[in-house]
């Protein structure tokens, strides 16, 4: 009987243990859960997920990993993944800072300082991983030809610790970014509320103006056309009257100019006649005097010629 009870007790305990262990096995590991969140998150989280996957592969310390560690290929790949992660993280942080502009300056400075510290811790963790692998490569090269089992064991232990620290700091950074994003969203909502308060009166004025325009649009088309026609007719009459007045002014100005020109021409003609008479009074006495002198000279010449042609008396008679 005791044996039967002991068998039943063992069976019961085994069943309880199976029930207890079953949900534990079904729960995903924290690292796997975190990796799933990274793969479906922001660009910086995706880049960090690639770094995490590569680090898990390095931690296997397979023959291929050890070969690439000795050739510095692993450290180069980790450096590339680190730079990519930090670049995406800085870009995401800059976007959030732009969205935080409506938030108070003190709150924005505090959040930025906390986020900067978390970002620095994550970068230091990744740098520690890379430095530890560089150190391992140097140690292996120094022990060329000797057993490196102890070095691999120490490296595996260090990598496990670094992975836990990296996971913790990445989770902390994720939470701080979530707070940062919530603050940005709250600031954006405040900014929208302020814009609505400023634009509310303008929108109301626009609504009233639209209603006024709508009431004007409801008038009969014929009345509006007549009103426009009367305005246009009055405008044309005003323009025509101004044009006629301007033409009259131009005509008067042309007549004045013509009268002045005729007067000036008459004055010039009189001045020319007076000048001509003056010239004539100057030169007529000179001409008459020259004519008299010329006539006297001709008479003298003729007299001299006549005297020279008379016959000379002869002494023989």
Curated annotation (Swiss-Prot):
Region entry LDL and other lipoprotein receptors binding, spans: 158-168
Name the UniProt record assigns to this protein: Apolipoprotein E
Signal peptide: 1-18
Pfam families named among the record's database cross-references: Apolipoprotein
Highest taxon in the source lineage: Eukaryota
Record InterPro entries: ApoA_E, Apolipoprotein_A1/A4/E
Purpose: APOE is an apolipoprotein, a protein associating with lipid particles, that mainly functions in lipoprotein-mediated lipid transport between organs via the plasma and interstitial fluids. APOE is a core component of plasma lipoproteins and is involved in their production, conversion and clearance. Apolipoproteins are amphipathic molecules that interact both with lipids of the lipoprotein particle core and the aqueous environment of the plasma.
Residues binding heparin: 162-165, 229-236
Region listing for 8 X 22 AA approximate tandem repeats, in residue ranges: 80-255
Family (UniProt): Belongs to the apolipoprotein A1/A4/E family.
Native source species: Colobus guereza (Mantled guereza)
Region Specificity for association with VLDL, residue ranges: 278-290
Compartment(s) where it occurs, according to its Swiss-Prot or TrEMBL record: Secreted; Secreted, Extracellular space; Secreted, Extracellular space, Extracellular matrix; Extracellular vesicle
Record flagged with keyword Methyltransferase: no
Keyword Zinc applies: no
Subunit and interaction comment: Homotetramer. May interact with ABCA1; functionally associated with ABCA1 in the biogenesis of HDLs. May interact with APP/A4 amyloid-beta peptide; the interaction is extremely stable in vitro but its physiological significance is unclear. May interact with MAPT. May interact with MAP2. In the cerebrospinal fluid, interacts with secreted SORL1. Interacts with PMEL; this allows the loading of PMEL luminal fragment on ILVs to induce fibril nucleation.
Region entry Homooligomerization, spans: 266-317
UniProt KW keywords: Chylomicron, Endosome, Extracellular matrix, Glycoprotein, HDL, Heparin-binding, Lipid transport, Lipid-binding, Oxidation, Phosphoprotein, Repeat, Secreted, Signal, Transport, VLDL
Start and stop residues of the Sequence repeats: 80-101, 102-123, 124-145, 146-167, 168-189, 190-211, 212-233, 234-255
Residues bearing PTM Phosphoserine: 147
Modified residues (Methionine sulfoxide): 143
Molecular function via GO: cholesterol transfer activity; heparan sulfate proteoglycan binding; heparin binding; identical protein binding; low-density lipoprotein particle receptor binding; phosphatidylcholine-sterol O-acyltransferase activator activity; phospholipid binding
One term under GO cellular component: high-density lipoprotein particle
Region (Lipid-binding and lipoprotein association): 210-290
GO biological process, one term: acylglycerol homeostasis
Post-translational modification: APOE exists as multiple glycosylated and sialylated glycoforms within cells and in plasma. The extent of glycosylation and sialylation are tissue and context specific.
């Amino acid at each position: 009987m005791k044996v039967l009870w002991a068998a039943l007790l063992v069976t019961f305990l085994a069943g309880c243990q199976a029930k207890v262990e079953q949900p534990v096995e079904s729960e995903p590991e924290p690292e796997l859960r975190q990796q799933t969140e990274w793969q479906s998150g922001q660009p910086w989280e995706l880049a960090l997920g690639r770094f995490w996957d590569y680090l898990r592969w390095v931690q296997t310390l397979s023959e291929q990993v050890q070969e690439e560690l000795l050739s510095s290929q692993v450290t180069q790949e980790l450096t590339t993944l680190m730079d990519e992660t930090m670049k995406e993280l800085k870009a995401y942080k800059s976007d959030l800072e732009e969205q935080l502009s409506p938030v108070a300056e003190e709150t924005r400075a505090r959040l930025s300082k906390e986020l900067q510290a978390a970002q620095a811790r994550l970068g230091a963790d990744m740098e520690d991983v890379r430095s530890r692998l560089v150190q391992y490569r140097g140690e292996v090269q120094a022990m060329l030809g000797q057993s490196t089992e102890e070095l691999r064991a120490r490296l595996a232990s260090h990598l496990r610790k670094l992975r836990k620290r990296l996971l913790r700091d990445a989770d902390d950074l994720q939470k701080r970014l979530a707070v940062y994003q919530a603050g940005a969203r709250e600031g954006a909502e405040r900014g929208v509320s302020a814009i609505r308060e400023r634009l509310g009166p303008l929108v109301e004025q626009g609504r009233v103006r639209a209603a006024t325009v709508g009431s004007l649009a409801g008038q009969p088309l014929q009345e509006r056309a007549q009103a426009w026609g009367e305005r246009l007719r009055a405008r044309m009459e005003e323009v025509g009257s101004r044009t006629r007045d301007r033409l009259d002014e131009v005509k008067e100005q042309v007549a004045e100019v013509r009268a002045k020109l005729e007067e000036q021409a008459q004055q010039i003609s009189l001045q020319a006649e007076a000048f001509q008479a003056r010239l004539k009074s100057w030169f007529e006495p000179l001409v008459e005097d020259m004519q008299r002198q010329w006539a006297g000279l001709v008479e003298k010449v003729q007299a001299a010629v006549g005297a020279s042609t008379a016959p000379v008396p002869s002494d023989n008679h």
